[in-house]
């Protein structure tokens, strides 16, 4: 099993007192499997992704990723897992304005010490970005920038891809096209994909679907 989440809890302190965002979440994901995570705003979807991605730590429970217990790691260990094992795509593209598209795509792979020029070129080609490689992010449309962000995430060949509304800034038809491309490329790498989405149409493109309600899997 690529990912096993067991009895995960997370509580934040608010002005009104403690707020339990996650209240004992369990899930599993196999290598090569795609899973949609749906739910209302505030149900804990993004928090769950942040915990799995090592961007935050749970109050209790376990996250075992690729044989490593993330909850037993320190900050440096979680950072290493983010570089070497996990790829993250957010709704905001967060491309580097001063870098050409070719270098934006290769950026994460170079940080991880896993840069493969041929694979980056393949990603650019499959995403329809080859004509844009010498351009800068500001010269691309929103849909093109999101394709760059996805290619950048896949460039290091992560074992697990976490996607938080990765096509949220796109219209429904374009979003479906971009997700289809992303699913093809994820399948080529054998990675697992866990995606947060509000779209029933996009969730339907995934192999499995889980629904979060008030911090629990419904």
Regions of interest found by a model, annotated:
Residues 2-3, 8-212:
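ABC family nucleotide-binding domain
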Residues 214-218:
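Conserved switch/coupling elements of ABC/ABC-like ATPase nucleotide-binding domains
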């Amino acid at each position: 099993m690529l990912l096993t989440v067991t009895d995960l809890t997370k509580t934040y302190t608010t002005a009104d007192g403690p707020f339990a965002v996650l209240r004992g979440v369990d899930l599993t994901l196999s290598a090569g499997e795609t899973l949609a995570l749906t739910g209302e705003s505030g149900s804990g979807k993004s928090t769950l992704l942040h915990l799995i991605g090592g961007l935050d730590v749970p109050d209790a429970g376990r996250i075992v990723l690729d044989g490593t217990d993330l909850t037993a790691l320190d900050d440096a260990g979680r950072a290493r897992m983010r570089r070497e094992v996990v790829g993250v795509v957010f709704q905001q593209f967060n491309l580097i304005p001063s870098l050409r598209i070719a270098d934006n795509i290769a950026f994460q792979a170079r940080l991880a010490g896993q840069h493969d020029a041929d694979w980056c070129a393949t990603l650019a080609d499959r995403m329809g970005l080859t004509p844009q490689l010498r351009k800068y992010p500001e010269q691309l449309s929103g849909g093109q920038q999101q394709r760059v962000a996805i290619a950048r995430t896949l460039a290091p060949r992560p074992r697990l891809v976490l996607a938080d509304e990765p096509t949220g800034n796109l219209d429904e038809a374009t979003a479906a096209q971009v997700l289809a491309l992303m699913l093809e490329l994820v399948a080529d790498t054998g990675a697992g994909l866990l995606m947060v989405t509000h779209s029933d149409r996009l969730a339907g493109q995934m192999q499995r679907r889980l629904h979060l309600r008030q911090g629990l899997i419904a």
